[in-house]
Design a protein with these regions (language model features):
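Positively charged, small/polar-rich N-terminal and surface patches that mediate targeting and assembly
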Residues: 1-113
Length: 113
């Protein structure tokens, strides 16, 4: 694989403690950095912002916790390491409402890594 191949790692993680653990994991792995954004999932919007649907809260596990979206441009090898760490922190994403992680190819990138 060429040295310039990059992927965008996208993770949505529920809970402040989990996102702190993920950031510690990024530092321990020596990953170049990440952007962390506050995020709202459909369950959070439906169950809190639309009172008419508040009865559906039970359909959206984890809707009471804050959500964070983590974005990082990484090499494929770094993505593998980061996903393993995220799975460890988030208990393999087995519980509904814990979060998700995936990556997409980056076709063009400008800036330092």
């Amino acid at each position: 694989m060429p040295d310039d191949v990059r992927q965008l790692l996208i993770a949505v993680v529920k809970g402040h403690r989990r996102v702190e653990a993920v950031m510690e994991g990024f530092l321990e792995l020596g990953l170049p950095g990440a952007t962390v954004l506050d995020a709202k999932g459909m369950g959070q919007i439906v169950s809190t912002d639309l009172p008419i649907f508040s009865g559906f809260r039970s359909l959206f596990p984890g809707s009471g916790e804050e959500s964070y979206m983590i974005l990082s441009v990484l090499t494929p090898e770094q993505v593998t390491e980061a996903v393993a760490m995220l799975r460890d922190v988030c208990n393999d994403f087995q519980e509904k409402g814990t979060g998700v992680v995936f990556s997409l190819p980056v076709l063009d990138f400008h800036g330092p890594l």
